A protein has these predicted regions:
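Soluble cytosolic regulatory domains appended to membrane proteins
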Residues: 6-194
Length: 194
């Protein structure tokens, strides 16, 4: 490499074409090519394109008891929940279940003051790469997406952003966690999948 040589600029389109060509020749596998393509789309994608819609979000309500919150947490198995007051558009904060269970036995007022943290609000037009950088810097991996009127469109997590780059993570994790199924056929015989 000649350090005095002029740098050759390569466009996004040329890199995409090289990745496709490498994939067709078998030099780059399909998953690697998909990640390269997703990387270039990442900065063009608004967060509302992949946010979990407000109708699909499990919420905690300020007028519920801690017992109701615990039941909701056990039934839905998420790690962070928006806490709303009166309407879904009035998010007063977010609750991480680690904090909720760490303060088990405390009053609801204590939980609201010490465990429910301020929500990170973002406009629906924010690009995925901007939110990714913001979450990385702030270490806040949960954002409430708002429409132009301040109403909640949905939520986006760091996991959602990563899935835009590398594909669905939950299915991959679920496959790893699945144990081979087995069934007993007779006293000395078992059928084991896998």
């Amino acid at each position: 490499i000649d350090p005095n040589a002029e740098a050759v600029e390569v466009s996004e389109e040329e890199i995409r074409k090289m990745a496709d060509a490498g994939s067709k020749k078998g030099v780059i596998d399909l998953e690697e090519n998909e990640i390269i393509q997703n990387l270039f789309e990442f900065d063009d994608m608004a967060v509302d394109e992949f946010a979990t819609h407000r109708t699909d979000i499990t919420l905690l309500w300020t007028d519920e008891t801690l017992q109701q919150w615990e039941e909701t947490i056990h039934d839905s198995r998420h790690t962070v929940y928006p806490v709303c007051e009166e309407t879904v558009d009035h998010v007063v904060g977010v609750l991480n279940i680690k904090d909720f269970f760490r303060f088990r036995g405390r009053t609801k007022d204590f939980i609201m003051k010490h465990a429910v943290k301020p929500a990170q609000f973002i406009p629906k037009s924010v690009k995925a790469d901007v939110l990714f950088r913001r979450m990385k810097v702030s270490h806040n991996h949960f954002a409430v997406v708002l429409d132009e009127y301040g109403g909640m469109v949905g939520i986006v997590t760091m996991n959602d952003l990563l899935e835009q780059l590398v594909g669905d993570l939950e299915d991959d994790l679920a496959e790893l966690a699945e144990e081979p199924k087995s069934s007993r056929i007779s006293k000395d015989t078992w059928k084991i999948d896998g």
